[in-house]
Amino acid sequence: MTPAARIVAMLGVVALVITVTSCSHHTTGKAASTTATSPASTTSLAPVAPVTGPALPPFIPSPGVGADCRYPPSTDPAGKPAGTPQTGKVATDPAGIGLTIVTDRGRIGLQLANNESPCTVNSFVNLAQKAYFDNTECHRLTTAHALSVLQCGDPKGDGTGGPGYQFADEYPTDQYPPGDPALKQPVVYPRGTLAMANAGPGTNGSQFFMVYRDSLLPPAYTVFGKINAAGLTVLDKIASAGVSGGGEDGPPATEVTITSARRD
């Protein structure tokens, strides 16, 4: 199955949705009239009008952050053997963890938000240490005005693969009460954001996306880190080549292979 984006139009607003391909997850919403700021592009990406919408909510820690990380089996088998990360309570100190993704297009430095999304970081670091991401392709590039991301982390390379387990959403989803209508309203995921793709609530696995231009998404995608300036330059170069075959969503025209991902 090829990667796909769900496009939903409501009240004149169009949102492209980041998903694991097997999902049928739909989101809708109307953007507000504020603008988030983010690091400027340093390459030849074509200029576009800034997206407008409310910013991600501030992180307010709760006693439950990192207190009980669980990784139950997913409905789909593992695309590559990975085992299960440490379960139960995980440390939120240090607050930030450095990790570098090395690709055949350059190095992408990450600062993982261990204090905000520790269960996600725990899984991501575990997968990296087990070489799970090594020799995998970043299978999806989106270049739409409201969604500009590179999606990676699938060992199958077609948008359907995962580690064989799943886990709950963290920041920013956990900043809202369950069932809050605001969870369906787009917010700005700023340039430089590292977040998880999913197939609906609580279905995080191994697929993640990197935002190279401010994008509008509902706050249903766990943010677990930031991309450094050098990494954004690499992403800009990949994005400037566009999508294979044209269009705004599909495999990147410049193939991207992760050769390694390791904690700094």
Regions found by a protein language model. Name each.
Residues 2-8, 12, 17-264:
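Cyclophilin-like peptidyl-prolyl cis-trans isomerases
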